[in-house]
């Protein structure tokens, strides 16, 4: 009887103790996370000191698996002398565009404004060795236009921020208001067209304000001056061509006259040469005749009449042949 009474008493005492312990644990405050959330307003903190950043999304299973490891890594941040942060790409699409995050989870190391992509697993031991052994020094940094602090990535952040706002607005239409998705798409198409027309109108107004049109009279004068200038230019070109033609004709005429004069000079020279040759031949014939006469006087009676008349005849034939050859040569030169 006593044993049966003790069992319920012990059970009641154990339940009371468990309830009291649960109340004490509930009364204790939750342990504060050492991971610092990063937003578009405070992300510049990573430009100073050494940081490790994690980009995640609440719906990403891989991101959820590394949450506990990331918290452990953040708790030991003081020992490692490093700050640990995280970025929710759903709430901060601009930062995901600034770091050009395309896969989740994504990890980045920052040292005095120089960023590097960490591509290892999100396990505490690997993260700790990455910092202690300074493995980040062997990783190529994001420099130039790839750097999150560059002007290019600032523009990319603006584009991602606008796309995030459009996505939130689409969810508001389809989830909160219950509007069909195709109605939301039609709304965005119309809004895009209206925005384009509005921007075009603004550009036209700006051009009209800053680019003052010329008066009509001045524009007509400019056109007349331009037409007269073109006509004068055409006339000058025509005159120049005519002058060239005239000069070419005069040159041709002068060249023809010079050729004719040269031909006449050549003919006169040939005639003079022929006269000189004829005179020379006549002198030769006279000398030969005188020689024959002298020989005839010396050798009177010793030479027969046939021999006496044969020698002058032979010399005369030779002279005539020479004259004929000379004339034929001159005729060939003239032709």
Curated annotation (Swiss-Prot):
* Principal cellular location given in the protein's record: nucleus
Please report the stretch or stretches of sequence annotated as the Thioredoxin domain. 26-133
Q: Which UniProt keywords apply?
A: Disulfide bond, Electron transport, Endoplasmic reticulum, Membrane, Nucleus, Phosphoprotein, Redox-active center, Signal, Transmembrane, Transmembrane helix, Transport
Residue positions, PTM Phosphoserine:
247, 255
The UniProt entry's GO CC annotations, sorted and at most eight, read: endoplasmic reticulum; endoplasmic reticulum membrane; nuclear inner membrane
Gene3D superfamilies from the xrefs?
A: Glutaredoxin
Q: How does it sit in the membrane?
A: Single-pass type I membrane protein
Disulfide linkages recorded for this protein, renumbered to the chain, are 60-63
Q: Does the keyword Electron transport apply?
A: yes
Q: Which PROSITE patterns does the UniProt entry name for this protein?
A: THIOREDOXIN_1 (PS00194), THIOREDOXIN_2 (PS51352)
Compartments annotated for it: namely: Nucleus inner membrane; Endoplasmic reticulum membrane
Q: Where is this region: Disordered?
A: 222-316
Span of the signal peptide: 1-20
Specify residue ranges for compositional bias: Acidic residues.
238-280
Q: What domain of life does the native source organism fall in?
A: Eukaryota
Catalytic residues? 60, 63
Q: Which residues cross the membrane?
A: 186-206
What segments bear the compositional bias annotation Basic and acidic residues?
286-298
| PANTHER family assigned to the protein according to its UniProt record, in alphabetical order | DUMPY: SHORTER THAN WILD-TYPE (PTHR46107), THIOREDOXIN-RELATED TRANSMEMBRANE PROTEIN 4 (PTHR46107:SF1)
Report the protein name in the record. Thioredoxin-related transmembrane protein 4
- Native source species: Mus musculus (Mouse)
């Amino acid at each position: 009887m006593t044993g049966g009474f003790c069992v319920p008493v012990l059970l009641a005492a154990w339940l009371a103790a468990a309830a009291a312990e649960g109340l004490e644990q509930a009364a204790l405050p939750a342990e504060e996370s050492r991971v610092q959330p990063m937003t578009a307003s405070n992300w510049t903190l990573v430009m100073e000191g050494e940081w490790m950043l994690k980009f995640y999304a609440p719906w990403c299973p891989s991101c959820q698996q590394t949450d506990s490891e990331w918290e452990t890594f953040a708790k030991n941040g003081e020992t490692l002398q490093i700050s640990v942060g995280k970025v929710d790409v759903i709430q901060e699409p601009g930062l995901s565009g600034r770091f050009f995050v395309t896969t989740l989870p994504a990890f980045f190391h920052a040292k005095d404004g120089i960023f590097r992509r960490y591509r290892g697993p999100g396990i505490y031991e690997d993260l700790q060795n990455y910092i202690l052994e300074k493995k980040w020094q062997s990783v190529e940094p994001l420099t130039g236009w790839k750097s999150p602090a560059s002007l290019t990535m600032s523009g990319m952040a603006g584009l991602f921020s606008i796309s995030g706002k459009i996505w939130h607005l689409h969810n508001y239409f389809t989830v909160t208001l219950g509007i069909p998705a195709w109605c939301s798409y039609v709304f965005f198409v119309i809004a895009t067209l209206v925005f384009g027309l509005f921007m075009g109108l603004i550009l036209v107004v700006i051009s009209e304000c800053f680019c003052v049109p010329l008066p009509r009279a001045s524009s007509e004068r400019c056109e007349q001056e331009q037409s007269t200038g073109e006509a004068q230019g055409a006339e000058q070109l025509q005159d120049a061509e005519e002058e060239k033609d005239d000069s070419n004709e005069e040159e041709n005429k002068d060249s023809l006259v010079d050729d004719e004069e040269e031909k006449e000079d050549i003919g006169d020279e040939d005639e003079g040469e022929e006269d000189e040759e004829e005179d020379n031949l006549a002198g030769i014939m006279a000398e030969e005749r005188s020689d024959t006469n002298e020989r005839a006087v010396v050798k009177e009676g010793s030479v027969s009449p046939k021999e006496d008349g044969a020698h002058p005849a032979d010399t005369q034939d030779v002279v005539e042949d020479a004259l004929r050859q000379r004339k034929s040569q001159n005729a060939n030169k003239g032709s």
